């Protein structure tokens, strides 16, 4: 979708724009694209799905709802975290972020013109609870959209800040706290 849109914009419409595509070297099944999400893919995010709470195996005081946002290969960890939260009796809205930069650009353009509500804000209005944004970039990348999160919502970012580490993907994701268990733990903490 993004490559097709970019090629049309550059070649057919002759716009002076720059596109880049980040490639990952991890093998994973690409999640199915929900219907009617083409605009969201191009504009930076779309609602991937929603999980309704199951009765938790162990009764807990914590229930409620959270919103998880994930990009790139970390989206698979976000989906696993959502399943863990669902098993704990928590409702989860899941958003796939295709471009933190595009979301930030849209928000900044809106700051300048003030003509409409930023796209990210619109998308998050129908979700619930604290928002956990996970990325395999440094936390500063998802932080670029903080200003466009609905005002009454807690927003926590998770990323891979640091350098010089070498290990397995699983170990590195656990170390940087962007694995499913860490994302679920961040959501539980945000619900306190």
Model-derived features: where do they sit?
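Thiamine diphosphate
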Residues: 1-192
């Amino acid at each position: 979708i993004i490559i097709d849109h970019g090629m049309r914009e550059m070649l057919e419409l002759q716009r002076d724009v720059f596109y880049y595509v980040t490639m990952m070297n991890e093998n994973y099944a690409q999640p199915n694209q929900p219907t009617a999400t083409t605009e969201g893919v191009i504009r930076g995010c779309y609602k991937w799905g929603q999980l309704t709470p199951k009765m938790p195996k162990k009764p807990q005081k914590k229930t409620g709802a959270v919103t998880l946002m994930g990009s790139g290969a970390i989206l698979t960890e976000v989906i696993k975290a959502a399943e863990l939260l669902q098993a704990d009796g928590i409702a989860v809205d899941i958003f796939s972020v295709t471009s933190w930069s595009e979301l930030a650009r849209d928000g900044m353009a809106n700051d300048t013109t003030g003509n409409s509500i930023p796209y990210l804000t619109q998308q998050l209005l129908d979700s619930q609870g604290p928002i956990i944004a996970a990325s395999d970039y440094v936390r500063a990348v998802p932080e670029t959209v903080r200003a466009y999160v609905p005002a009454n919502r807690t927003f926590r970012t998770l990323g891979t800040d640091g350098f010089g580490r070498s290990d397995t993907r699983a170990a590195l994701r656990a170390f940087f706290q962007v694995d499913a268990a860490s994302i679920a733990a961040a959501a539980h903490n945000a619900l306190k």
